C-alpha cells in the first residue's frame, strides 16, 4: 500500500494571470495591487507567481508572512517591494533594513527603535502601519490617541511610512455588516491622519 505524505497541486499560471486581470478590471484604473503570496503562495509557489506578476505595472509589490519568505523573493531577483505582514522580532530588523524589506509597524515604541537602528545603519526603513479594525491581532486600535501615535511615527528620522492596512476578518461571508464596520473604522483613521498631516 502506498502512503502519501504530501499533496501535489498543479497551478495553471495562465489561470492565475487571468484571475489577476479580472480583479484589475473591477477596481479603479489608477489603483495598484499587492499580491499576498505568503506561505509559498499558500503552497502554490510564491516565486513562480511573483515572477509572473513582476512585469504588471499595477502590481505594487508582494506581501508575505515572514522574513524568510521575503528573503526568498529578494533572492529571486525580484525588483518590486516585499512587505512582511506578520510579527517581526528585533533581531531581524537589521536584515530587513539592509535588504529593503518593508516592515509592519504596530506600536510607536517599535517604530522608534526601528528608526534609531536605521539611523545608526545610515539607511532608510520602509514601514506600513497595521490597523486592528476587528481582527483582534496585531495593530493599532482605532482611537484618537493612536492617530496621534501614528502621526508621530511619520515624523521619525530615517523612517518612510509607505502605507497602512487592515485585515478584513469576515470579508468572504455573505453578510458584509462586520466588514463594512471594519472599513468605516479604517476610513475614520485615514481621515484622522489626514488632519494631522
Predicted regions and their residues:
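Glycine-rich phosphate/diphosphate-binding loops that line cofactor/substrate pockets in enzymes
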Residues: 20-31
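Active-site-proximal beta-alpha core segment in soluble small-molecule metabolic enzymes
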Residues: 3, 7-10, 15-17, 31-196
Amino acid at each position: 500500500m502506498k502512503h502519501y505524505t504530501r499533496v501535489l497541486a498543479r497551478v495553471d499560471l495562465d489561470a492565475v494571470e487571468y484571475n489577476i486581470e479580472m480583479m484589475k478590471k473591477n477596481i479603479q484604473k489608477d489603483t495598484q495591487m499587492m499580491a499576498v503570496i505568503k506561505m509559498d503562495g499558500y503552497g502554490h509557489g510564491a516565486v513562480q507567481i511573483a515572477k509572473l506578476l513582476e512585469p504588471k505595472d499595477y502590481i505594487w509589490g508582494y506581501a508575505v508572512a515572514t522574513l524568510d519568505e521575503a528573503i526568498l523573493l529578494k533572492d529571486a531577483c525580484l525588483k518590486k517591494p516585499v512587505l512582511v505582514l506578520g510579527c517581526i522580532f528585533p533581531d531581524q530588523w537589521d536584515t530587513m533594513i539592509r535588504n529593503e524589506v518593508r516592515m509592519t509597524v504596530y506600536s510607536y515604541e517599535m517604530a522608534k527603535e526601528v528608526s534609531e537602528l536605521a539611523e545608526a545603519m545610515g539607511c532608510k526603513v520602509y514601514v506600513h502601519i497595521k490597523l486592528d479594525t476587528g481582527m483582534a491581532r496585531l495593530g493599532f486600535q482605532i482611537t484618537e490617541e493612536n492617530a496621534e501615535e501614528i502621526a508621530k511615527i511619520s515624523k521619525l528620522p530615517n523612517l518612510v511610512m509607505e502605507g497602512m492596512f487592515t485585515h478584513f476578518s469576515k470579508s468572504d461571508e455573505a453578510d458584509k455588516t462586520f466588514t463594512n464596520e471594519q472599513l468605516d473604522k479604517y476610513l475614520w483613521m485615514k481621515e484622522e491622519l489626514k488632519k494631522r498631516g
